[in-house]
Amino acid sequence: MKRPLIISLILIFTSAACSLTSPSPAAPPPTTEAVSASPTSAPAEASPTAAHPAETNTTLLYISGTTHIESKPQVWPDVDAFLAFLQQVTALGMKWSVGADIGWLEGEPRAAELIQASEALGVQWDIHTHSPQDRAKAAYLITQMGGHPNSVVSGMLVSEFNNIGPQTYQGFTWTPQVLWGGTNCPGHRPGCDDLAAGLWIPLSAEQYTTHNPNGQYIRVGGGTHQLDDGRILAQSIANGQYTYPVISFTLMVAPSTLKIVQSSDGISEIIDFVNEMNRYPFVRWVNIEETAQAWSAAGSVPSRIEME
């Protein structure tokens, strides 16, 4: 009985040993899901527009408004109508200035009333005289009526340029710093007026349209004063045609008609114009003197633009 028992034990041990040494079936490899890259996970260099945003035009268009009152009574404004007009344009956000000649300052019974009431609206008083020697007198008269004349020579013959400088009247000294307007012949005949927009510094009458940083006075160009030309200028800036830091344009209204000079455009058309211009983020509403100050602060880069 021992032999069969021994043989059985040998067979059992052999079977166990075979089970221990036989390799187990290979485990299946772990499954990995394919992960698609998110667009935001791309390296920055793969997106040039993200790394280098497109440049935007930083040009600013400074639009002012002005009116000249001459010495002839037949073209003087009705004081009440003019004040109502100034109330309307300033309520729109515009900045206005008025240049009045000696005849009106001395002859209009309500001159002081208009000066003070308009200044309360933010209107400035420029110096506009047909006789160059009367500029200090005009400034003096404005102060005597409670006003605050600024440093703008508003309108002049180009031939007078070389004689511009500080003047004193009755102990009051007035010093010019800014020029607006300029004509090569009296009477504003066709082809006489300098109708450029933009700003520059002229050195002399002979080089009136050329920028020279050695000059003393900032020339603020008013352009043609026409609403449609202002629209064209704004659209040109929007299209990137000009890259000057500061460009100027001025609306000019006749005192007796309260319409844009050489035009039938009145307050309704001006309101439409202002609303259109307000859609451009680069438009600023300022007066003439503030335009010159902004240009200086922006680096005094000449921006003369012919509009004739």
Model regions and ranges:
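Short, solvent-exposed mixed-charge patches
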Residues: 18, 307-308
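Active-site-adjacent pocket scaffolds in enzyme catalytic domains
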Residues: 144-256, 297-305
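Active-site beta->alpha N-cap acidic-glycine motif
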Residues: 50-117, 244-293, 299
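Ser/Thr-rich, Proline-interspersed low-complexity disordered segments
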Residues: 10, 18-56
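Alpha-helical scaffolding within the catalytic cores
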Residues: 77-85, 105-118, 198-207, 228-239
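Metal-dependent polysaccharide deacetylase catalytic core of the NodB/CE4 family, i.e.
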Residues: 92-167, 176, 183-185, 248-258, ...
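Sec-dependent bacterial lipoprotein signal peptides
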Residues: 1-16
